[in-house]
């Protein structure tokens, strides 16, 4: 039996092989399927989890609380928005904010082969790879720009409003 994403996130990756693939979800949530994301397992790595939960001013260290990172599989079930994010990548805005009050976003490479196997995954297996999860100050304006350009395939106006309110409240409290 494989160790779950939430358990590894809460442990900040300590004690796990840093290169090992970590299953986030066994298949793509329905809300993401409607955005055209292929129905494949969603995968991450311990190395990425360590970077995301490390507080630092250095590049690629985002300082996400482990409990917030652990909730990402649930948050992916009802995204705020799904939009193009560069060459073949997709951004999924989540209805949550980080400790600084910045809206949370997950970036994905879609239908990519794993370079390393491990656990329930084989090397070369196709997955939707979660590249990174972090708070992004400009996320709400990026969603609006993607909508205006017709590049936002899922959009929940009520959730976007809720996210904006959460972000303002957390920033005031910080």
Regions found by a protein language model. Name each.
Residues 1-174:
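Ribonuclease/tRNase effector modules and their secretory precursors
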